UniProtKB/Swiss-Prot annotation:
Its EC number is 3.1.3.5. Binds 1 divalent metal cation per subunit. GO terms for cellular component: cytoplasm. It is an enzyme of class 3 (hydrolase). This is 5'-nucleotidase SurE. The gene is surE. It comes from the Bacteria. It comes from Wolbachia pipientis wMel.
Length: 250
């Protein structure tokens, strides 16, 4: 199996080094193409349409850093760096959870969405932490979770988001929705001496879905789809609102 690894925390992060070790369990060939700096929060954004150039630095035969976003890295890996299409894309291991609205902001998720858009099975992995990051649960359980996911498979337009709890005792695996944060949580601004501001965002969760299960000590697996369309609302609007809008172009 050929595996492409990327992330949003940067080429030198501990998480990507760990993911390389995890991938050794089932990969015949491992490629790493990751941002040269921390690009957390980049989502599925692209630098290449607006930058005149993007740098690619080769560190070893199959390891590269890129002066772009996680999604840029996947595109560059598939179209420039790799000589074969990977069988699987792994993104992470992210420092911190990817649940609730984080899924929309996450470069870890954005990278695998870029892979799924090209019909490549793609998994994002994240390690929850509180005060200090502890990779133990990822080290122990990631190889098993990845192997099981590859075995059962999933639709091409879906990515898998896996979160490992910070709790020492893992209770098991739960398939769960992403959950919700109170996005209007406390956002504080602290002015720095140079006139810039430091931001701190404290958000409360709804107590549902993946967020709650992680707190209880479960590994969570959340299928995330590329297509954001709400088909129930779309069909309702087609049936009940079409007449209201029919005269706009007259």
């Amino acid at each position: 199996m050929i595996i492409l690894i990327t992330n949003d925390d940067g080429f030198g992060s501990e998480g990507i080094k760990l993911l390389k070790e995890v991938a050794r369990n089932f990969a015949s060939e491992i490629w790493i193409v990751a941002p040269d700096t921390d690009r957390s929060g980049a989502a599925r954004s692209l630098d290449y349409p607006v930058k005149q150039s993007i740098g690619i630095k080769q560190h070893s035969e199959r390891e590269f850093s890129v002066s772009g976003t996680p999604a840029d890295c996947v595109i560059i890996a598939l179209n420039k760096v790799m000589n074969k299409k990977p069988d699987l894309i792994l993104s992470g291991v992210n420092i911190g959870s990817n649940v609730g609205d984080d899924i929309c902001y996450s470069g870890t998720i954005g990278a695998v969405m870029e892979g799924a858009a090209r019909s490549i099975p793609s998994i994002a992995l994240s390690q929850v932490y509180h005060d200090k990051i502890d990779w133990h649960n990822t080290k122990v359980f990631a190889p098993k979770v990845i192997a099981k996911l590859v075995k059962v498979g999933w639709p091409k337009n879906i990515v898998m988001s896996v979160n490992f709890p910070a709790k020492e005792k893992v209770k098991g695996v739960e398939f769960a929705e992403q959950g919700e944060y109170n996005i209007d949580g406390d956002l504080t601004f602290t002015e720095n001496s140079n006139g810039s501001f430091s931001l701190n965002w404290s958000r409360e969760h709804s107590g549902s879905g993946s967020i709650n299960k992680i707190k209880e000590g479960f590994i969570t697996i959340t299928p995330v789809k590329l297509d954001f369309t709400d088909y129930d609302t779309l069909n309702t609007m087609k049936n009940s609102c079409a007449d209201e809008f029919s005269s706009i172009a007259d």
